[in-house]
Amino acid sequence: MERYKLRQVIGEGASSTVYSGVSARGEEVAVKVVPRKGRSTGMVYREIEMLSTIKHENIVGIVGRFESKKHVYMVEELCDFNLVSFLNEYEVDEDVALKILRMILCGLRHIHSLGIIHRDLKLGNILLKGNTVKICDFGLSCYVEENNSEFCGTMDYLAPEVVDGKKYSFGVDMWSAGVVFYVLLTKKKFCESLDSLECSEELRDLLEKLLERDESKRADASEALMHRSFSRFIPRCEDFRGLPGFERGTKYGVLRKAGDSVELGSIRIDARRGKRHGGGRKHGDLGCLCGEEFTYSVYVDSEEIEPAFITNGQLKTLGLLTAHVKAMREKTPKIIIDDDGNKFYYMFSGGFVYVGKELTLRARGGKYEMSRRSGEKTYLEAVPDFLYEAIGGLEARCKAIDKEVCWFSRESPVLIDCSSHQQFSMSCISQVSEMSIRNRVEYDYIESTGWCIRDGLNFLFLMNDGEMFEVLCPDLAVRYRGRLLFIDDRLPMKLKRSLKGISPFLRSLCDGCYMS
């Protein structure tokens, strides 16, 4: 023991004593001291062997071992306290209890994948180091193929099959995890019933799956981690495929987007080919994003993993990565319209920035920030009345283009830069954006009126005054402001005026004399 100096006792068990200690290099550790007598020696050797094969953030790490004639010393990472002390010192709400349970389940999933049954999971054998849960004390643990279903563990945490002397497997750890979760929620001993438990239906459902008396029906660690209760902790990634590439260093590693992937440190997200809305493509190009639902795969150290199984430490990195993607979508313009010096930036997120001669208006999370040239800022619940018509028209134009156009460029944002309504042209889009448009669609500019997007016998009109409507010739109908109106209905006066304005254009199509 020349390398370590023992300090105070921090834990005692039936066959061992745990001390805090410090190495010659100043590293703080925990030292488990086990006398060489009875079964204790074999158990500690077994524990050292198991912990040496387990490398996981939710399992206490082994640093080394030493021996003397009378004792075996197992050196482990030092933690702050166990869950018994934690419960005595802090109030635990549902969110905190769920976070603790999730880390316990991550640890159990890992050891179960190695064929190890813990067999003595309880509050005293679950440690906290900072905000991270660590399962410890593998003295009663065994490999599943060597399991003889002996009676062992701590009475209050024993699964029914252990108490009844039946054969058992990994499910005993799941039952114990359920008991730990129950105690975290109630600070009471589990009494075989959930009738008096006051909690959300979601948590009750999770507990019922963990405390299922029939081991064959009891949730395993993977199934429990997939429970909807934990979805609140898993960050979702927004569609990054059209964003420009980026690369920068952070304290968590290199943050990078290249092609259909984003990554940070050991975490990578790959976009994958998903289903298309309506079941079909707008054209035959397999690289097109139009109508394709955004789905993705998550990788840790180049191995694909279900996001529900990602550890708490990895979730922090994943959260930073998805937050950066979201921020990039909010500040990267997809379409820019220059309207007589007033610029409208339509972002990948669906938000916008309107930069006028006297003010700037930003849409942020359903609210608006208006900044005047004087430096005065105002926060609003809605677009100001004096900008409502202009902003509404510009936003409608961008949404219509975003919906109808097939975007191919995924290495840089797709931008449209037009100096006025009259110069707002699809040739401008294709030149600036380097995109292609599906062959069966044609775009026509109607002098002093607006744009028409022709899709077969359907016509989408983007008017210069901001109005948008679709004429469905086969149905003799008009889609206007979310309603389907038939030509012989009583149409709104403004729509009637718009239809009257486009009638010469429609007649010219019928006569075959219109040149696009």
UniProtKB/Swiss-Prot annotation:
GO terms for molecular function: ATP binding; protein serine kinase activity; protein serine/threonine kinase activity. This is Probable serine/threonine-protein kinase ECU02_0550. PANTHER family: SERINE/THREONINE-PROTEIN KINASE PLK, SERINE_THREONINE-PROTEIN KINASE PLK4. The keyword ATP-binding applies. It catalyses: L-seryl-[protein] + ATP = O-phospho-L-seryl-[protein] + ADP + H(+); L-threonyl-[protein] + ATP = O-phospho-L-threonyl-[protein] + ADP + H(+). The lineage of its organism: Eukaryota, Fungi, Fungi incertae sedis, Microsporidia, Unikaryonidae. Keywords: ATP-binding, Kinase, Nucleotide-binding, Serine/threonine-protein kinase, Transferase. Residues 4-230 form the Protein kinase domain. InterPro entries: Kinase-like_dom_sf, Prot_kinase_dom, Protein_kinase_ATP_BS, Ser/Thr_kinase_AS. The keyword ATP-binding applies. Its EC number is 2.7.11.1. One of its GO terms (cellular component) is nucleus.
